[in-house]
Amino acid sequence: MTDYARYIDHTLLAANATEQQIIALCDEAVAHRFYAVCVNSGYVPLVAEKLKGTDVQVCSVIGFPLGAGLTASKAFEAKAAIDAGAQEIDMVINVGWLKSGKIAAVQADIQAVREVCAAIPLKVILETCLLDDEQIVLVCEMCRQLDVAFVKTSTGFSTGGAREEHVRLMRNTVGSEMGVKASGAVRDRQTAQRMIEAGATRIGTSSGVAIVSGEAAAAGNY
């Protein structure tokens, strides 16, 4: 039987997320033994304090949700988040650079954050809904060469979330050693199971409680 809890990065990334909601997120993660809590970097100190002494990891997004900032700012934010207690980093690639053919710049962007995250797992968000298969494969191969821990489908803030065919393509490209995180629109146990069967080893969702309980998630959840 699948232990769904250990796949879940319990996530709250909304701009209007309150401290009380973040605290509740942490409490749910501890109660259900989720793998991690994933938040914006400004909430990392609070989450690190709430999760101290537990097995739940602290995950921060970087360059979120557009990925279009300066590379130096992403590296700075990642270091600041780690210093504040982040144990995993999820960064967004610069999709515009990729679609402009600036492949070396995309690689340098990832590498700069990877160097900051030398001691902790880095997950690279591709925003697959904006890419074609060739671009997905290109970034996955790039991440494998840079020894990135995970490739991740989506921010959940663009035109679409995780799709089985993209998860399967990512898994087939990176092989069995790297992680694949499916995120965005994974709101129930059936969808989570399909993503896992397609090759996902982590699920980013705000519907973790619904997934582990087998219940329906609230409308509009990440």
Swiss-Prot record:
Keywords: Cytoplasm, Lyase, Schiff base. Disulfide bonds: none annotated. It comes from the Bacteria. CDD domains: DeoC (cd00959). It is found in: Cytoplasm. HAMAP family: DeoC_type1 (MF_00114). This is Deoxyribose-phosphate aldolase. The gene is deoC.
